[in-house]
């Protein structure tokens, strides 16, 4: 279906709503991923952690975000090239590894952005360019969808239109995630939160990065510091009470202390936060007014840092996510 979506390019954004509406009538809700997921970012680069081929990623992960697509000279357009340092003999070898992971029930998405890259979607032309190029890459490599990790500002109106067009091209099997920073999700008026709400009908999960962050307000109006169970639970509560479904909210954390500048928590603290939100147990000082048994799960930066530490993070958090209600 992705290939057909590229043919819509000239009228991608304009056609998105109409096509998407037809899709939703014919197809059930997305079932491309389990009810609770462990998500990890995979490095298409060597940063001194561990170089991994995709096939070497721990089987605990349900969603793997390939990091990263890059911008081109055309505003909004994205591209992807394998880093030679990974040692792939061919692009086909990488495509075969994606297919093998998918055969195991794992979704592989292409992440757009990161701290180093600037992808700008702020008008109809750039929204069209984003959607057309994203659909092309999904078709070329066999990705299940797109992860939005834009860290230099977004325009919710046009990014929403771009993702609606991607959804129209792929259909309801699209896996669509995002990883905003904490400041991006403090309230529903922020552009990132608006993007999530605008596209909630086909949004798989928001994995806010609860690290590399200063202190932030929780949903109770109190100030919480990063690196604590309360930071995870009280901030996730903002999204849970702000219009997203529990199945669309996940906790993003570093896999090891080296994986982030600040905000690392022990994997058992991640499990406690999941329990607090899903079951009302193992909370810190913040206790949510209700439980959210449908909570999506957890995300980590990154599968490579996790592997560098013997997969201790995924071996601890993965089974716990699987055991959520």
PLM regions with names:
Residues 1-5:
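N-terminal export and membrane-targeting signals
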Residues 271-279:
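Active-site-adjacent alpha-helix of alpha/beta-hydrolase-fold enzymes
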Residues 6-14, 299, 304-325:
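A recurrent domain-boundary module in secreted/ectodomain proteins
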Residues 10-32:
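C-terminal region of N-terminal signal peptides and the immediate post-cleavage residues
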Residues 58, 278, 321-325:
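Generic secondary-structure transition motif, activating predominantly at the C-termini of alpha-helices
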Residues 27-250, 255-272, 289-295, 305-316:
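Chitinase-like catalytic core of GlcNAc-active glycosidases
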């Amino acid at each position: 279906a992705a290939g057909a979506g590229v043919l819509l390019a000239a009228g991608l954004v304009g056609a998105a709503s109409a096509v998407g509406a037809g899709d939703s009538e014919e197809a059930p809700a997305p079932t491309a991923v389990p009810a609770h997921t462990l998500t990890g970012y995979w490095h298409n680069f060597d940063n001194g952690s561990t170089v991994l081929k995709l096939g070497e990623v721990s089987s605990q992960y349900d969603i793997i975000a390939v990091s990263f697509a890059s911008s081109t000279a055309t505003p909004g357009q994205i591209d992807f090239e394998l880093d030679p340092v990974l040692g792939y003999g061919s692009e086909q070898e990488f495509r075969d590894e994606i297919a093998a992971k998918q055969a195991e029930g794992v979704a592989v998405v292409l992440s757009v952005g990161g701290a180093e890259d600037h992808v700008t979607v702020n008008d109809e032309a750039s929204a069209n360019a984003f959607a057309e190029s994203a659909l092309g890459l999904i078709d070329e490599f066999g990705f299940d969808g797109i992860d939005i990790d834009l860290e230099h500002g977004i325009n919710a109106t046009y990014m929403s239109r771009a993702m609606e067009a991607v959804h129209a091209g792929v259909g309801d099997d699209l896996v669509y995630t995002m990883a905003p920073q904490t400041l991006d999700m403090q309230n529903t008026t922020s552009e990132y939160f608006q993007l999530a709400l605008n596209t909630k009908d086909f949004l798989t999960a928001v994995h806010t990065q609860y690290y590399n962050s200063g202190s932030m307000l929780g949903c109770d109006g109190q100030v919480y510091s990063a690196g604590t169970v309360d930071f995870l639970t009280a901030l996730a509560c903002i999204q849970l009470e702000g219009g997203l479904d529990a199945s669309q909210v996940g906790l993003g954390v570093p896999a090891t202390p080296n994986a982030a500048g600040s905000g690392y928590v022990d994997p058992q603290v991640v499990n406690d936060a999941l329990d607090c939100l899903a079951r009302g147990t193992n909370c810190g000082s913040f206790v949510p007014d209700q439980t959210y048994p449908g909570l999506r799960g957890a995300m980590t930066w990154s599968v490579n840092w996790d592997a560098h530490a013997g997969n201790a993070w995924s071996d601890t958090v993965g089974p716990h996510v699987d055991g959520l209600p």
